[in-house]
Regions:
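Radical SAM enzyme [4Fe-4S]-AdoMet core and its adjacent flexible, acidic
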Residues: 1-66, 70, 79-80, 84, ...
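Flexible mid-to-C-terminal extensions adjoining Fe-S/redox cofactors in radical SAM and related proteins
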Residues: 88-170
Length: 170
């Protein structure tokens, strides 16, 4: 697949791993810690062997696990314009339709700021998978709205089983 992308002229590619979220999550499809390590090694090896930029969304330049949303590196805009911390955190306080410029929203949103601090202080991985309880508390504290069309994200978060993410301190 990497070679095919190079043949097609792609200059870079992103690796994302499945996050079992939503009303019909399939946790059996999520990678085990061993499988995640195997993918991570593959990405690192391909970076030095292939003439294409390879971005692993869940690791920093030093190879340490991270949550891109906890760094402020990424946000997600829902189809309705809601500004979410990441694609699987489907809660928001702000919208692209708010009066202030986007840069102000990204930099001054108390919800986004508190999300970053919460995620960074509890894991280098995915807070949704590792600590959905804390994420639920944060959404309640801020009165963040469910940005899904099904309006079940809060219940889904509360019923989640803890799962490993990309952070593996062992």
């Amino acid at each position: 697949w990497v070679d095919r992308l190079i043949e097609l002229g792609a200059l870079y590619m992103w690796y994302h791993t499945y996050r079992p979220m939503g009303p019909e999550a399939s946790p059996e499809l999520a990678l085990s810690p061993e499988e995640q390590l195997r993918i991570r090694k593959f990405v690192v090896e391909m970076r030095v062997k292939k003439p294409i930029g390879i971005i692993d969304a869940y690791y920093d330049a030093d190879g340490k696990a991270l949550c891109p949303a906890a760094t402020g590196f990424t946000h997600h805009i829902s189809p309705w314009g809601d500004i979410e911390p990441c694609p699987i955190v489907q809660f928001a306080r702000e919208s692209i339709y708010d009066e202030r410029p986007l840069a102000d929203t990204f930099n001054n949103s108390q919800f986004l700021t508190d999300f970053r601090q919460l995620a960074a202080s509890h894991t280098r991985g995915c807070i949704v998978l590792e600590r959905p309880d804390l994420l639920h508390e944060l959404t309640v504290l801020h009165g963040a709205k469910d940005t899904t069309a099904r309006n079940t994200a809060s219940a889904e978060l509360q019923s989640m089983t803890l799962r490993p993410s990309q952070y593996n301190p062992a």
